[in-house]
Amino acid sequence: MSSEKLNVIALISGGKDSFFSLIHCIGHGHQIVALANLFPGPGPDSSSAISGGQSPFRREDATKAGSETNLQTPSDLSSPVGFQHIDPGTRTPQPPGPATGDHDSLREAQGAGESSDTDLNSFMYQTVGHEVLPLYADATGLPLYRLPITGRAVRHERDYDATANTQDKVQDSDETESMLPLLQSIIARHPEANAVCAGAILSTYQRTRVESIALRLGLVPLAYLWQYPVLPTPSADISADTQLLLDMANVGLEARIIKVASAGLDENHLWERVSSEAGSSRVKNALRKFGSAQGAAALGEGGEFESLVLDGPSSVFKKRIVIPEQGRRIVREGGGCSWLMLGGALLEDKHDATAKPAARIPNLLDPRFKTVFDDLPQPMNELKAAKACLTLLSQDAGTFTTDSEVLRWSVLPDLGLGEMSIQDETAQVVEKIRDLVSGAGVQLSQITSTIIILRRMSDFPQVNGEYGKIFTKPNPPSRVTISCGDLMPAGVNIAISLAAPTPRATQDRNGLHVQSRSYWAPANIGPYSQAIDVPVAAQGQPTGLRCISIAGQIPLIPATMVLPSTPEKPHELQIVLSLQHLWRIGQEMKIQWWTSSVAYFPRANSSEIQRSAQLAGYAWKQAHGSPDEEVDGDNGPDLWDLKYNPAYMSLGNDDKIARKALPDWEALTLRQQNEPETGIPPMFAAEVEELPRQAAVEWHAHNGLSGIEEASFSMCALPELTLPGWKTWHSAVTTTSATASFCFPGHLED
């Protein structure tokens, strides 16, 4: 994957997020080739049979309208049932406005027996306001393709598994799969399309479903708004949770609230222009009354409200949509939910030629890591002092109980079988892994982490193809990949180390696998997750701790997936940027403390390696900061969490869902809180042959820990009496049932 310009299909719901993601695509030089939309469909086989209605446009009208302006569509192209193609310039018939009293004709257009007074309320698709969607073709000058939603929400798990529909012999298809024929039909008409964009901000539920469909079709998934609230704001005075709305306002995006479903917001907030400073402030103030004004809630990510875009920058909107007041009828569903049924929508030419600024691109580095970067390079004597302080760890006496419920293997191909291709070697290693895992009574999907060591990094594409065959489920293990050249055993070109829980371990496994390009952290396209999170047990009993394995992080720019090319301190930037990636993933996984880390560097002369190690050591120390700098990084839950995750059942108390800071200094024992440098985890440097993408550094955190109680974590270093010069670093966590110790040995040179 590179920074090539992409031809993008934009998934739109009519809401603010999907259009703002489209605007960011244009800002990166990508071309939007088509708009795509899914809307409630009729009949018992569709999700609308449960609680929705059909588009208020007759299908024959839409089909006729779509054929009035031929978009070079071959006549032999097949289309799924209900497929709509609406060209720019087409005047799609509008249904009568609710204020005219002609509701019979409106219902007739929707289909007999279907109620229009109920929204679909899907976790996946926004459908309120769908009656206006056909106007977007003419408003934007882009072809619009639409398809009715079929099926229902069969798969309720957060991380979508498309294979489960077949394996579980589910009769009804999941509503997610409606995207597949829609995008296939668009690709047939626009074969140049190679990417798809969506507006996911914090919803893993939505993001993983779009990614599943996109990757099956060979499309690059783009989610430029992903984790937007944690990205740097232009000013420290601006609240991060509403910065997105202000950025929308700055580019001229006009988004109106058309549905409210939250304590704090009522029908008086309908038609509020949320993409404005005043509107976003009013929404946040209303939500604050019920303790839910932070993070996701202020953006509507928890389902608090939904919006409809009427206008935007001239790069997207050639005309604006106008809906008269008499065309906005309030529908009250009960339970605090109300929305607007819209009619009489019109298009108006835009007379204001004032150019709006381009969409703000968040800074590459957070303030914390920008400070770390600005402080590099330090004079060599200061760097050496920083390195030394990493070894000034306490040597507390004490007995720590350890009880590993982790299986570990290192797998190499068989020697003595003659020369094999790297693909054959990998296939043999993969088959050995299958046998080992099966013999241990665990599943391949339970593997938590792997380390791939290659002789040549150029072999990686062939290795990845075979390796990926054993990880077909969501959230594959995290992975670190390095090349060690001729340090590999003779005749061996690949070795894989892996870890998995024992069969008796609790199978409570969470993962983070972001495969979309964003501004947040590099996308992991392929069979490896950013992080895997499993519980820690002692003697078969839960401790409340969780251990997180993080993939190796190289310094790719997340939005473009290329290495930075800045002339200013390029080596230092790579060290700091990849460390920031590690931190962002750790914060998303609610990690409170690292046990240790290693920074891998490609082969270079000794002075360059020494300087790289010292720079990384200084950056590692500075990234930990001090207890005085601790901040809260909560961003709130998404809609799936609110319904299915017990930790997020109430919006009324943000303290219940607040994330701990990384590092969480309050987790340290009181003595180490007073001596913070003694609590910084050890960081090691290792010289290897090559790194992926010819990167200058790869950060590998050995373990991240969460669930640590206050004042229960300590770091200590104990000398190995039988091995002069060696020490073992212990990260010890005391719980109510046990003390868990995570160990890492290292050799110290004088």
Language model regions located:
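Short, structured patches in soluble enzyme cores that scaffold and shape functional sites
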Residues: 225, 257-262, 311-314, 486, ...
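Ordered, small/hydrophobic-rich secondary-structure cores
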Residues: 238-239, 243, 247-305, 312, ...
